[in-house]
Amino acid sequence: MCISFGYQHIGAAAGTFVFYATVLAGLVAYDVVSRTPVPRVRVVGALVSLAGVGVLTAPAAGDVTPLGVLLLAVTGAAWALYTAAGRTVTDPQTATTGNFTVLAVALLVPVGVTVSGGPTVTTTGLVLAALMGSVTTALSYVAWYACQRRISATTAGTVQTVIPILTAAAATVLLGERLTVLLVLAALLVFAGLWIGRPR
């Protein structure tokens, strides 16, 4: 909910940067608190990758409000906590199923209130939402839970900075958006950061 309301008070590009910066900071903090070694080179790599996200998003930062920053930071912190929690899970599939079931039940009441006095809900919309949540999103969460336990939390946070780069690259292929020098530079920085901070 924070991400949905947050983007009403902050530009998409700026919100993206705030989100990934908070995720990265949260996962570095997790490593520190859990006494996981955090080599300086790994922190440098994380900062270089985050700089790549900054290069990608800065030109289109748009409107930035304190409320928008706060809500996207809360979203990033929540995802960092969810990621950190997954590091102790032995059965990613069962854990994700349980999480999604609890969330679905918790959202039934506000959805019912919204439907009763809000926008029209169609069968197609409900089916697509269910597929996106129960299939694509759930499978990606299971895969992420299974993979990220093999790397440090800091590295897990750094790896996630690839997502906005891949999204922008996909937009050039699928939506015909222009491939820019900034996108190339951002990609180079992100992947350079991953290489610098790679596990040794």
Residue ranges of model-derived segments:
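C-terminal transmembrane-helix exit sites in multi-pass transporters
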Residues: 3-5, 22-44, 54, 165-184
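Transmembrane alpha-helical segments that form core, pore/gating elements
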Residues: 26-28, 61-115, 143
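Helix-helix packing/entry segments at the starts of transmembrane helices
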Residues: 15-22, 85-105, 137-173
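Specific transmembrane alpha-helical segments of multi-pass solute transporters/efflux pumps
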Residues: 1-19, 49-55, 133-151
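Hydrophobic transmembrane alpha-helices of multi-pass small-molecule transport proteins
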Residues: 38-58, 75, 107-108, 161-162, ...
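Membrane-interface helix termini and inter-helical loops of multi-pass transporters
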Residues: 7-8, 54-67, 111-129, 172, ...
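Hydrophobic/small/kink-forming positions within alpha-helical transmembrane segments
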Residues: 1, 24-28, 54, 77-80, ...
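Loop-to-transmembrane-helix transition segments
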Residues: 1-2, 41-47, 67-75, 120-140, ...
